Amino acid sequence: MSSEGRYMTWKDMSHNKFMTDRWARVSDVVSVIKQSHAMDLSKAANLSIIKTALAGLGSGWTDNNPFVSPMTRFPQTLTMYGALVLYVNLSDPEFALIMTKVSTLTDSGLADNASANVRRDVVSGNKAESSGKTAGTNENSAYTLTVSLAGLAQALRLEELMWTRDKFEDRLKLPWTPVQGRTSPPGQXQLAAARVTAHIRAAKRALLYPGDSPEWVGWKHFYPPPPYDVYDVPPLDIINAKLAADDIGGLVTPTPASSHGLPFEVSEEVEQANRNSLWLTVGLLLAALAVGIGVAAYHRKKLQSRLRELKLLWGSTGGSGGGGGFDTELYMRATDTVSLGTTLSEHAASAPSGLRHRPAATDSGPHEALPFEVWVFDNLAVVYDSIGMSDLFYTVREFVGVFNGEFEGLIELLESPDDDDGVYTNAPRDTAIDAYESQENYDRIDIETVLIERRINLKKLLLEEAELERRERDMTMIADEEQRTLLHRLESSRVEATHAVAKAEADARAAVAMAALASKEANDYDSKMAFDRSCKEQELRLRELEVNSMPSKTERYVHTGIQGGAQLAGAMAVGAMLRRGAGSSSQTVSSGANIGSRSQSLTRGRSASQPLSSVGGSTRGVNNNISNTNLVRAGNSAEVSAGRSTNSGNSNFWSKLRVGEGWSKYSVERAATRAQRAIVLPAPPSAPAG
């Protein structure tokens, strides 16, 4: 990965994942879920529509430039209204399982996409199992589409699945923005992610997250409703107004974004206040520079004047040794060095006991000069004080150290012997007093210097303490955020466990209901089988009764003979009619009448041959006629049975003897009519006289 945040080759796994994954906007996913719930999930025809809508999420996401940073591809960015537009990766395992489950659904059993309401109605018995274009229940009582949509909606509620800045940088090792030769300060990514998390949490608390607001209720389109058509999460001012209106509390204040953070939208008043403060800061800085430059120039001139006096003093040639006409002893330290780099108390001279001076060659008369070392240290103290007042202490301190090295040559020059002796006298008392006053001045300056150093050290300690407090606050904020994240995960785990327990209970109740339904079906099947067995037994019993009610073989033979004779007589009569022609119709009638009279005489003869006793005899005659009629009827039945037996054989005769109830009635009525036509009942005999 280069310094600009781009990718080197196509072999980078993070780059391939970043390019090939399915990135979808949160509001689009929620809109598809809302439309799917608005449709009838129990209809098999709606399954293809829902699958197409879910498959289209994130399919066309690209900007035709693969070598870009995540921020350029805006998986999470800000709109012109200052609101968050969030993206999720549908290729993550949490979403990939759900998308794969939905994409593999089929309507083969017309049950994969059945809704829970249909399932309850079917199990409770209020609704029969549907077929055709509607969906019923499957064997394992699983309603995959309903459960998948519910799981997808629940996954969108988790903040851990949102791709924030720190998630891109930590998980995929991708820089959020192209790095222009420098890296962002540590903690900027975490701060930006914390702002985004706080924004999302506030939106969920105010019920202004995609899918929570009333605008989503009943929304059946694939694009978001009007308040969400340009952003996913509303701006902070809308969220704060909603929280204040609901009297919830916990308002979110927009934190100023850093140079590498998210560009939060600010109001015009805040921008004007920032501009005013900037101009005020610039003015104060210019004023401080002017005062500092003036003070530094003043003390610089003062320092130059002091150095000029020293130069004039060093350049005086009063004696042959070039020592300036002074002959005195310098009260030095044990090391015989002079150092102005530490404290001025080291250079304080003790009270001189015997100092000599040479009168100056002036018109005003003799003048007693101060000791040379006291005068030099006095001037150096003034120079040191000027350096401290001009805030150039640490800078000029090195210069003073160099000056000390040059001053050693001057000390050697002063220690050289002077040829002109006897010109010095003892110093008066005033000289000692001035020396003591100089000593007090040196001590005062030394105390002030120590106080300045202590103030500087105190300021350093305060700065270090403030830095430690800031680090402690940052660590506390990070620990609180981690604690809140852990609590949220624990709550999510608890909710998932509750859902799992509820699902297990529902499955158990459904299993009990299905077992009861199966038991009911088994009982119904047993009742049906018992009814079938009873029907078959009744049928066999009826067949046995029919077989037992059949006429005997002798009766069948008599009836067959009578019927054959009747058919032969009829055939002979028809043949005679055909031979005689159309004019012999009367003869045919007469022959028929003769046949009828012959049968009547036969009947009468049979009736007369039986003994009669007054009324009882007539009754027996009627009974004989009725028995003859039954004989004819039995003969007709035997005729039908005989005709069938000739075709099917004697073995299966009784199995094919049964006919329909209507045909049996018709056969009996026809046989009775024939018997009444063929048999004429005789007139009852008259009672004997007397």
Swiss-Prot record:
Q: What else is known?
A: This protein is translated as a fusion protein by episodic readthrough of the termination codon at the end of the capsid protein. Readthrough of the terminator codon TAG occurs between the codons for Gln-188 and Gln-190 in about 10% of translation events, thereby producing the 75 kDa readthrough protein.
Which positions does the motif Involved in virus transmission by the vector occupy?
A: 553-556
Write out the GO MF terms.
structural molecule activity
Question: Is ATP-binding found in the keyword set?
Answer: no
Positions of the region Disordered? 583-628
Gene Ontology CC: helical viral capsid
Q: Which UniProt keywords apply?
A: Capsid protein, Coiled coil, Helical capsid protein, Virion
Protein family according to the UniProt entry: Belongs to the virgaviridae capsid protein family.
Gene3D superfamilies named among the record's database cross-references: Tobacco mosaic virus-like, coat protein
What's one GO BP annotation on this UniProt entry?
viral translational frameshifting
Q: Which residues form a coiled coil?
A: 451-509
- Protein name in UniProt: Capsid readthrough protein
Q: Which InterPro entries match?
A: TMV-like_coat (IPR001337), TMV-like_coat_sf (IPR036417)
Please give one Pfam family short name: TMV_coat
